[in-house]
A protein has these predicted regions:
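Feature marks extracellular polysaccharide-active and adherence modules
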Residues: 1, 20, 66, 71, ...
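Extracellular "leader-to-stem" segments immediately downstream of a signal peptide or signal-anchor
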Residues: 2-78, 98, 143-145, 149-167, ...
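The right-handed parallel beta-helix/beta-solenoid scaffold, focusing on the short coil/turn
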Residues: 15, 43, 61-66, 85-86, ...
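Short, flexible coil/linker elements and helix-boundary hinge sites characteristic
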Residues: 30, 328, 417, 634-635, ...
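Short glycine/acidic-rich loop motifs that flank beta-strands on beta-rich extracellular proteins
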Residues: 74-80, 85, 105-112, 127-135, ...
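Hydrophobic alpha-helical scaffolding
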Residues: 177, 395-399, 603
Length: 723
């Protein structure tokens, strides 16, 4: 049981774990020199320092800590003692922390070399480090997390210090969020207040690997350094619609001498100075606001700065250029568009442009990224199923088809008022289509995101549509306001018989929505031809959150006139098909990277309006994200908001095939990447219109990209044939 502190005047309520071990532990944050093979760099041998620190809760692959608070009753703000990490992800993938309050941890959560951590909807007071990330090689996510002294101070627990004395300590000693190497970290709605360093970004101890990341709605205040950037990898940091505020005498942002790459700010407010001692690189500011600086808003001693449509609150002392400054370019920036520069550089190239013809619409604010009320069945009634299944750490597959029994149980639950049908952990065989009735949820053992490797509740199938093939009904059909949660799906016969990894079996979509407000949450596709069909019916208000896996030809396709839907935290990567749980557990092992890169369309949007596409990622696809005319309604994509989308290893990372005059796609923090794919001679980050002078994309159709990053091996950066 757990309650959010901010909803209870800061009080810590519900389940509380009292930690009375580890006080003054000598190995509270120990590490040893070690070596590892980097799968992201051709298995190159790396040298690093691996944590061997003690920890209170060790989180291995496929684990979650949810709905509780953790408190150290013997900690004393007047005599602070170190304790081991409260939560520690050791290795592997998929460690989730959700609805957790760390009342007064010394060190909060450590993600050691691993993948796919997810910290969300949680609160932390940490006396040394709140969250620390090391060598995350597949998308880590931090979402809606608050780190502040107030959660201990206002907890109502015995021995809690005053907010003033606790803040004095954390501002002198503590770091809120510390990120070493992380490949494509997604950080959103992170709030940090009252720390010596709010966010620290930099290298791994012992070698030069650093992170790239995107930050959205990140707000830091009252810190000596709101954001401290030691170094960033060549792909850069994107920061949008955020704010960084300094304590008195501090810096809103500081760049250390090792910084030499790229950091992009868009729609960011700064309270206090930005200081850079970086050796080179580019720092760009677009639609930013600079305020509350006593000396200079920007003190740049080296490198390159770009200013676009930025406002400075003070009339002077906007930019100080140090001796080794290389370039300053400004467009429509300054106080009332008058930019004041104190130039001490040897030979910096300075270009100032003030002209209305270069004015543009700034990044939109207040974008909605999540649903107000999360979907759930209409009743609290839970029915636990007891069907034939395979269990254990072996390679056995289920042999009895439970389709009829499962459908009967779902129908009976509907008849009794709706609710949840719970499938305990194990592997179930479902070889005929089932329909989840309105108001009913089919739920497995997973309460958090998970990988094929983690086992749990799984539905295995050989269903391929029979004579109708891929056009037959879907295996799992969701009626209006029906959902599926916490289950893994596996198409057993995808490469059996006459089919192979080069030519896998075509099947219907595994899941189909057949009405409004359908939902799919924490579902993994271990292997399947097609994922979720939200295009054949109007599924307005649909909600998909953390669909992981490896669909081969189609991921999530949306259309049918749907309005107001959400697709969030999609995570597609071919390794879901080749990393199996202990003992194999009957899953087919398939390596499909080459096939998906030439055949998959991961995300497809047709006749939809007011769609929210948030923090999704696909590795390996022809089209990472694809917009086109609806085959059923004949209508075009409408207005959509896309925040934090990542396409990696794709032929075309973003493809607008069809669009009319009302199509408007707003994209923020996009990371669009091509790799050199065999048999794909033309590749580009963006393709708008498939052919030159195409009539399928209206000249007034809009694709608006704010704060984007592009890298890889394109033939052309962007191919714009219309719009």
């Amino acid at each position: 049981d757990w309650a959010a502190p901010e909803s209870n005047n800061g009080m810590v309520l519900g389940t509380i774990l009292e930690v009375r071990v580890g006080k003054n532990a000598p190995n509270y944050d120990g590490s040893v020199k070690s070596w590892w093979n980097d799968s992201q760099a051709g298995n190159a041998l790396r040298t690093t320092y691996t944590s061997i620190a003690d920890r209170f809760i060790e989180m291995n692959a496929g684990t979650g800590v949810t709905n509780l608070s953790i408190w150290y009753p013997e900690q004393n703000i007047n005599d602070v003692k170190p304790y081991p990490w409260t939560l520690f992800q050791t290795q592997g993938n998929c460690a989730t922390i959700e609805h957790v309050t760390l009342v007064n941890s010394y060190n909060g959560f450590n993600s050691a070399p691993s993948e796919l951590h997810y910290v969300l909807d949680s609160y932390i007071t940490a006396l040394n480090k709140g969250i620390e990330v090391h060598v995350c090689t597949d998308i880590g996510r931090i979402e809606n997390v608050s780190i502040s002294p107030e959660y201990w101070a206002k907890s109502g627990l015995p021995g809690a210090p005053t907010l003033a004395e606790l803040t004095a300590y954390t501002k002198a000693n503590s770091v809120g969020f510390q990120m070493h190497r992380s490949d494509w970290e997604y950080i959103s709605y992170l709030h940090i207040s009252g720390y010596k360093t709010g966010i620290w970004i930099g290298r791994e101890p012992g070698f030069a690997d650093a992170p790239n990341a995107q930050l959205y709605e990140v707000h830091v205040d009252n810190c000596e350094n709101g954001l401290y950037v030691e170094d960033v990898n060549p792909y850069g940091i994107l920061i949008s619609n955020s704010s960084f505020g300094a304590a008195k005498g501090g810096n809103a942002v500081y760049f250390y001498k090792d910084f030499s790459t790229s950091t992009q700010f868009n729609g960011v407010e700064f309270s206090g100075p930005i200081v850079s001692d970086g050796s080179d690189g580019v720092i760009s500011f677009e639609s930013c606001l600079f305020g509350k600086y006593s000396d200079y808003a920007l003190k740049i001693n080296n490198g390159n700065v770009l200013l676009s449509q930025c406002h400075f609150e003070n009339a002077d002392k906007h930019v100080y250029l140090g001796m080794n400054m290389r370039t300053l370019k400004s467009v429509n920036s300054g106080h009332k568009q008058r930019l004041k520069i104190n130039n001490h550089s040897n030979d910096a190239k300075i270009e100032i442009i003030t002209d209305k013809k270069y004015a543009f619409e700034p990044i939109p604010k207040g974008l909605k990224t999540n649903i107000i009320a999360h979907p759930r069945p209409v009743s609290n009634q839970v029915l636990k199923a007891d069907f034939s299944r395979a269990t254990g750490f072996n390679n056995q597959r289920p042999v009895k088809d439970i389709s009829s029994e499962l459908q009967s149980a779902l129908d009976a639950l509907k008849a009794s008022g709706g609710g949840t049908l719970y499938l305990p952990a194990g592997r179930y065989l479902v070889d005929k289509p089932i329909k989840i009735p309105s108001g009913v949820e089919l739920r497995g053992s997973w309460d958090v995101q998970h990988h094929t490797q983690n086992g749990g509740t799984a539905i295995f199938t050989n269903y391929d549509g029979g004579d109708a093939g891929e056009n037959a009904p879907s295996l799992i059909q969701l009626e209006t306001n029906a959902g599926i949660r916490g289950i893994t799906l596996a198409q057993l016969n995808i490469i059996s018989g006459e089919y192979s990894a080069e030519s896998p079996r075509k099947t219907p979509f595994l899941i189909q929505g057949q009405g409004p407000k359908v939902y799919v949450i924490n579902v993994t596709i271990a292997i399947g031809d097609k994922g979720i069909d939200l295009a054949s019916y109007d599924t307005s208000g649909h909600y998909v959150d953390y669909l992981g896996g490896v669909p081969l030809r189609a991921g999530i396709w949306v259309g049918g006139g749907a309005e107001g839907g959400f697709i969030r935290n999609m995570q597609f990567n071919p390794h879901y098909g080749s990393r199996l749980p202990e003992g194999g557990q009957g899953y087919p092992r398939v390596a499909m990277m080459r096939f998906v890169q030439s055949n998959c369309s991961a995300l497809k949007f047709a006749d939809v309006k007011n769609q929210t596409i948030f923090n999704n990622f696909v590795y390996g696809s022809v089209y990472g994200i694809h917009f086109l005319k609806d085959e059923i309604t004949g209508k075009y994509p409408g207005k959509m908001t896309m925040i934090g989308h990542g396409s990696d290893g794709c032929t075309y990372s973003l493809f607008v095939e069809d669009a009319d005059k009302d199509t408007k796609i707003i994209a923020v923090n996009s990371e669009l990447v091509n790799t050199k794919i065999p048999n794909e001679p033309v590749r580009s980050y963006v393709l708008m219109g498939k052919e030159m002078n195409t009539s399928k994309v209206h000249p007034d159709a809009k694709l608006i990209l704010y704060n984007s990053a592009f890298w890889g091996s394109p033939v052309f950066g962007a191919i714009i044939n219309s719009g």
